[in-house]
From Swiss-Prot:
The gene is infB. HAMAP family: IF_2_B. NCBIfam families: IF-2, small_GTP. Belongs to the TRAFAC class translation factor GTPase superfamily. Classic translation factor GTPase family. IF-2 subfamily. Residues 527-529 are annotated as: G5. This is Translation initiation factor IF-2. One of its GO terms (molecular function) is GTPase activity. Disulfide bonds: none annotated. Keywords: Cytoplasm, GTP-binding, Initiation factor, Nucleotide-binding, Protein biosynthesis. It comes from Hamiltonella defensa subsp. Acyrthosiphon pisum (strain 5AT). One of the essential components for the initiation of protein synthesis. Protects formylmethionyl-tRNA from spontaneous hydrolysis and promotes its binding to the 30S ribosomal subunits. Also involved in the hydrolysis of GTP during the formation of the 70S ribosomal complex.
Amino acid sequence: MTDVTVKSLAEEIKTSVDRLVQQFFDAGIKKSQTDTVTQQEKEKLLAHLNRQQGTVDNQLTLQRKTRSVLNIQVTGGKSKTVHIEVRKKRTYVNPSVTKPEAPLPEEENAQIPKITKNTFSQESLNKTSPQKSLKTKAIEKAKIESPKKERHSLKEKQKKEAQSEKARREAEASSLKRFAEEEVRRKVEEEAKRVAEQARKMAIENEAKWSELVADQIDSVDYHVTTSEHARAAEDENDAKVEGDRRSRHRGTKTTKQKKTNKLSESKTDREEARAVVRKSKRKPSALQQSFNKPVVALNRDVVIGETISVAELANKMAVKGSQVIKAMMKLGAMATINQVIDQETAQLVAEEMGHKVILRRENELEEALMSDRDTGVLTVHRAPVVTIMGHVDHGKTSLLDYIRSTKVATGEAGGITQHIGAYHVETENGMITFLDTPGHAAFTSMRARGAQATDIVVLVVAADDGVMPQTIEAIQHAKAAKVPVVVAVNKIDKAEADPDRVKKELIQHGIQPEEWGGDSQFIHVSAKVGTGIDDLLNAILLQAEVLELKAVKSGMANGVVIESFLDKGRGPVATVLVQEGTLNKGDIVLCGFQYGRVRAMRNELGREVISAGPSIPVEILGLSSVSSAGDAVTVVRDEKKAREVALYRQGKFREIKLARQQKSKLENMFDSLREGEISELNIVLKSDVQGSCEAIREALQKLSTDEVKIKIIGSGVGGITETDATLAAASNAIILGFNVRADAATRRLVEAENLNLRYYSVIYDLLDEVKQAMSGMLSPKYEQKIIGLAEVRDVFKSPKFGAIAGCMVVEGLIKRSSPIRVLRNNVVIYEGELESLRRFKDDVNEVRNGIECGIGVKNYDVQVNDTIEVFEIIEIKRTIS
């Protein structure tokens, strides 16, 4: 037997080369895929594999596949090709193992050669070989002579019994499988028969039901059918006659071989079509009768209508055309298009008018269900008052609070002014007070309004030396709108120019009456610098809180309001929340406006971690999905999944409202498009450190817009300036304004590459002033006419070059050459042009001053004596935005 390589052996036994090399290595033989394998190495490998398996296999299984193609005739004379694959599997068993002989003496057992799997395989595959037959007989003879055959036969017998048991089980399993398949096929056939029987019965019923209508239709067309039958019969007879004549002419000329060839060349499809034609001609002619069941009763549907619905969607739910819905609305006196959105009441009237049942659905059902499924306590306890400090900018609000808290907050504010809402709670001898410090700048109106809404008492700080200012009046209006009591703190009382009585008189004009003058507002004279009157102010606040009898539920799920929110680079979205009811715990699921999340961490105003927060306690929470809007209500809920759905619903609703507000009438859009070329736009990308400052700056910038220059906020947000902001600014030709934020290195490189305008600010004054300057540069210049001289015409001369030359006397100002002029006659402008020639004693001059005679040439115009020539110049005036 020739040696083979490892690779060819692997292909022969259908295994991978790497696996065969590993098996050789496990058997103690080092081989590569190009090495040859001897017969002894094969036997050694086989013995190793037998030892691993624990048994010597005495079976050989052969598999064979045969493929064939079957052509099946289908309806219409066409043939269908079906591919058939037959798989056969046969197992051969070594007879020397299955038929053990009588036991032999044990002494001769050593003389028996070892029979391997390779030997069995060779004998099974080469039964016809005479050499193999002699070898088999020799082996059997050796077995008979062996004295130890008894033990070997016993082992082989046990193996045979195990194999026969295995074969029996496999046969039983296959028979059970065939039985199950037959059962499934039988059930499928029965179901198909049942469905066919039902269809047949239904067809019989329908035929009986509509037989009368069909009979009437047949009677109406019977004449035409009969005529067509006679025509077809005559045509068939004529065709048969022609075909018979043709066959009789060619019958004698065709030979047997030609007939056979024609028959073979005729396709099977043609013969099938011919048979079909013959069968069709033998059948009686029938009229094709088809009919459809017209619904006689209108279908009443249950139509679910939300708060708003479009006409097309309403028609789709009622399964009617949109035109029918529009007709029904016109009958009710409402005009609408198919894409128009109508309200719930109108849709209900239309649907009920068309005979459908209406089910009204509130779109905020999920939100209401989520809010109702909350644990709220019933036991109320006294809570600390929430005090908002309001007043004009630089009147000492933060300094006053700074003295109360004994910290240096005011020195840390940019520009010395507050630009955020700060929330702090202070422990005093008489109780705890929560303070909200609001900005006093005019741009932070919305932030002051939020502070007034979330507060119990307003402390109005007025500087004794400055009196009532615009933001002081605005703070009074916010307090009155929120129906909150006001405690007036007259600050800077230590200054020499302080005048508290003037402050009282000015506040009386705006509805703030002091107690000593018969009103209900307490006036406390304080000095945030030296600490005068601070204790009196705290006592006044606590006294006012006792009068209000402030109570809140301490147990149960918490409710609160967002005071401020911002995006921290390391911690993510952070919201400053003032708890109003219940207890906010770490790990609670909160719904906050358009955002939701789980409270991952809570910190107080000092930056320390806390586990829970009760009523009137401000905390910073981490874990929201995004930066929330300041002023949003914070609610603790049970289900995070439902909270997410409610947040997404709110976002979609807000988007719809925003789009509806942005949509203008067609007439306004038409006028806007006509004025587009006249209006300049200043595009701005705004980034701020907190949400409240971002909103305040947006409102302040939009108020700067004029009829000629419009401020357009392309993008705004909270957090640092990113590459996305720079890309947006480059695409829209906008400037980037950063308020208390910075750009990272990658963004700065992009800004330099795109040559963008990036500016940083920490004080809102500077930001607004520079934006005003940029807007002033975009204004179109203004031109004015300035009269620089007057000349009276004393005489007129003729010139061949210029025509009429006016001899003039300069009576006012000076006359410049090449300046625009007007000719006035009886104080009426009759000509406007340019001064062509200016001479003095026949010499060309550039200008002539007052009291000097000169000659003025006016081209192509007839100047008369006593006319007045007015010389002027056009001056460009630079415009600014106030």
